Amino acid sequence: MDPEVSLLLLCPLGGLSQEQVAVELSPAHDRRPLPGGDKAITAIWETRQQAQPWIFDAPKFRLHSATLVSSSPEPQLLLHLGLTSYRDFLGTNWSSSASWLRQQGAADWGDKQAYLADPLGVGAALVTADDFLVFLRRSQQVAEAPGLVDVPGGHPEPQALCSGGIPRHKDLPGLLVVRELFSSVLQEICDEVNLPLHTLSQPLLLGIACNETSAGRASAEFYVQCSLTSEEVRSYYLSGGPEAHESTGIIFVETQRVQRLQETEMWAQLCPSAKGAILLYNRHPPLQSGVGKSHLSHPSAPALSLQL
């Protein structure tokens, strides 16, 4: 396994639909206060704001744990979530003391992630109608993994479920949180790749991967089928979108070549979240064999193409 990524959860073959996932949102799943208080987080945030005055704080969902429930008629996944923030993420997962915090969490709570913000991300193994996976070259201007290759993705937003004010656990029903989790990955594809929503299938959850370069932050990785060909996707991407500034190019890799992507030079260019998405995608052969897919035409584009 690549040291930059680990797999926390592998969903049953073929992935899980929105109806097969549930959420328990509770303050018990929030980050523990740091030993000695959270002043270090405040100091890191103030320093970062001085260097990058355009950054802003925002609430995020925190992944505490995930449980597959095998006793139900169909496979069910229960996600135990809390609330956290981007500010706390920078002050814990991205802090120079992240390794020490993991050691202390294990010693104090039996959980190495106890003191970490661990905001839950989302990512997509997006497959075109002619059987190519879609990747994006990240801009040098983004805060995380600048210049590396990623899959479309981002974060589910607690704020999307609130009309205003600070999101509170009691105001966020589990069903709405699940809906936001699944809809957010589609929204990220629409914003980053500039694709119409009606061209995208309902997401299937493949599993959860952890970015070990940011102290084990988790990301839910999904499979999404697009009804457009790779050339049609490229055309939409090049016409620009709401988050066009976050990437500088689009890359297409033929799905049959993805199984051996770790053996290519491209693997070293992938950011950890993309590596997690590919590792999980490769563990779901039913999706690669065409089960549940729309009709696929033969690829006419090269196996690897980059548009700068």
UniProtKB/Swiss-Prot annotation:
<protein>
    <recommendedName>
        <fullName>Uridine diphosphate glucose pyrophosphatase NUDT22</fullName>
        <ecNumber>3.6.1.45</ecNumber>
    </recommendedName>
</protein>
<dbReference type="InterPro" id="IPR055295">
    <property type="entry name" value="NUDT22/NUDT9-like"/>
</dbReference>
<feature type="domain" description="Nudix hydrolase">
    <location>
        <begin position="117"/>
        <end position="284"/>
    </location>
</feature>
<feature type="binding site">
    <location>
        <position position="143"/>
    </location>
    <ligand>
        <name>substrate</name>
    </ligand>
</feature>
<keyword id="KW-0460">Magnesium</keyword>
<keyword id="KW-0378">Hydrolase</keyword>
<feature type="binding site">
    <location>
        <position position="138"/>
    </location>
    <ligand>
        <name>substrate</name>
    </ligand>
</feature>
<feature type="binding site">
    <location>
        <position position="273"/>
    </location>
    <ligand>
        <name>substrate</name>
    </ligand>
</feature>
<comment type="similarity">
    <text>Belongs to the Nudix hydrolase family.</text>
</comment>
<feature type="short sequence motif" description="Nudix box">
    <location>
        <begin position="174"/>
        <end position="195"/>
    </location>
</feature>
<feature type="binding site">
    <location>
        <position position="188"/>
    </location>
    <ligand>
        <name>Mg(2+)</name>
    </ligand>
</feature>
<feature type="binding site">
    <location>
        <position position="157"/>
    </location>
    <ligand>
        <name>substrate</name>
    </ligand>
</feature>
<feature type="binding site">
    <location>
        <position position="56"/>
    </location>
    <ligand>
        <name>substrate</name>
    </ligand>
</feature>
<feature type="binding site">
    <location>
        <position position="155"/>
    </location>
    <ligand>
        <name>substrate</name>
    </ligand>
</feature>
<dbReference type="InterPro" id="IPR000086">
    <property type="entry name" value="NUDIX_hydrolase_dom"/>
</dbReference>
<comment type="function">
    <text>Hydrolyzes UDP-glucose to glucose 1-phosphate and UMP and UDP-galactose to galactose 1-phosphate and UMP. Preferred substrate is UDP-glucose.</text>
</comment>
<dbReference type="GO" id="GO:0008768">
    <property type="term" value="F:UDP-sugar diphosphatase activity"/>
</dbReference>
<dbReference type="GO" id="GO:0046872">
    <property type="term" value="F:metal ion binding"/>
</dbReference>
<feature type="binding site">
    <location>
        <position position="150"/>
    </location>
    <ligand>
        <name>substrate</name>
    </ligand>
</feature>
<feature type="binding site">
    <location>
        <position position="192"/>
    </location>
    <ligand>
        <name>Mg(2+)</name>
    </ligand>
</feature>
<keyword id="KW-0479">Metal-binding</keyword>
<feature type="binding site">
    <location>
        <position position="86"/>
    </location>
    <ligand>
        <name>substrate</name>
    </ligand>
</feature>
<dbReference type="GO" id="GO:0005654">
    <property type="term" value="C:nucleoplasm"/>
</dbReference>
